[in-house]
């Protein structure tokens, strides 16, 4: 089992079609990785599926960077 961070980065690469080396913890989905609003919705859906959790819309809006996604999953996984 790979780490949560590795799994999140893999999803970001697949969903946004960016290079793995572009995906850093502080990378903003919109500003740095070129995601639009539809991309971010699909990204959240992919994270929900991968980690078998539900991310409420009001929480999803706060997740704007790779690290925020990792932190959210770490905090809510298994809680």
Curated annotation (Swiss-Prot):
Domain Carrier: 2-77
Subcellular location: Cytoplasm
Pfam families, per database record: PP-binding
Major location category of this protein: cytoplasm
UniProtKB keywords: Cytoplasm, Fatty acid biosynthesis, Fatty acid metabolism, Lipid biosynthesis, Lipid metabolism, Phosphopantetheine, Phosphoprotein
PROSITE patterns named in the record: CARRIER, PHOSPHOPANTETHEINE
One CC-aspect GO term: membrane
Post-translational modification: 4'-phosphopantetheine is transferred from CoA to a specific serine of apo-ACP by AcpS. This modification is essential for activity because fatty acids are bound in thioester linkage to the sulfhydryl of the prosthetic group.
Pathway the protein takes part in: Lipid metabolism; fatty acid biosynthesis
GO terms for biological process, alphabetical: lipid A biosynthetic process
GO molecular function terms noted in the UniProt entry: acyl binding; acyl carrier activity
Sites of O-(pantetheine 4'-phosphoryl)serine modification: 37
HAMAP family linked to this entry: Acyl_carrier
UniProt similarity note: Belongs to the acyl carrier protein (ACP) family.
Role summary: Carrier of the growing fatty acid chain in fatty acid biosynthesis.
Protein name (Swiss-Prot/TrEMBL): Acyl carrier protein
Lineage: Bacteria, Pseudomonadati, Pseudomonadota, Gammaproteobacteria, Chromatiales
Gene field: acpP
């Amino acid at each position: 089992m790979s780490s949560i961070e590795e799994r999140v980065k893999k999803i970001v690469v697949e969903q946004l079609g960016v290079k793995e080396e572009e995906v850093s913890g502080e990378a903003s989905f919109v500003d740095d990785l070129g995601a639009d609003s539809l991309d971010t919705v699909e990204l959240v859906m992919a994270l929900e599926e991968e980690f078998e959790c539900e991310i409420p819309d009001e929480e999803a809006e706060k997740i704007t960077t790779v690290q925020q996604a990792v932190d959210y999953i770490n905090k809510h996984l298994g809680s």
